[in-house]
Amino acid sequence: MIVCKSSAEIETMHRAGIVVWEVLNELRMMVAPGVSTLDLDRIAERRAAEHGARPAFKGYRGYPASLCASINEEVVHGIPSAGRKLNEGDLVSLDYGVELDGYFGDAAVTVPVGKVRSELDTLMRVTRESLDRAIEKARAGNRLSDVGAAVQEWVERHGFSVVREFVGHGIGTRMHEEPSVLNYGQPGHGPRLQEGMVLAIEPMVNQGTANVRVLEDGWTAVTADGKPSAHFEHTVAVTANGPWILTRPRDVSGPAW
């Protein structure tokens, strides 16, 4: 069942979202050659506590960390470790969520490590733009599939592929709620979006094949062909005034990331 949130609940989710925004922005400023993904995870966990929040991922279905840090061909759910250090030219996706006062916020950003190849810049840009286009469709009266169709159309127009095995989701008092928010499909299908719905919209886009596989750790998903992937995400509320990005401050406008 899709649960619509009250204005008060959405305000609480915005407070959780601001914690996510602030932590992710601190982490992406830390990204540099030689930094380990465990270094980033430790900061993510510490900052949640300083804000009176709880890291949403740690312990969720047994996940062992507060942050997902996925490098290059790793699509999502990369487990931080001391031995996994960033190198010049890498892409790293930072996916982070918190629970604050009983409500969740969730966002992700892909960050270049130093200078990256131009085709990786393009992959990041197209993925980020696909999120912008998806968020624009998160309006009352539209169909749920309009969101994913916007992602797929933009991504495939630029010669990249959309991951099917992992999708966005509803979010609220639980990290994952109904509905599933696909990043593909035909427009005009699924439930109509209503005021109070809150969606975690998160395109995952591969340079090569859309196919992925999960490593033996049971978490890290990688592209089947070893080519790089990018991932951007925001938590978005459907309101009377249009989409409201809850995982950034009210006074920030323009592109989602």
List each language-model region with its residue ranges:
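Active-site neighborhoods and metal-handling regions in enzymes and metal-associated proteins
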Residues: M1-W257
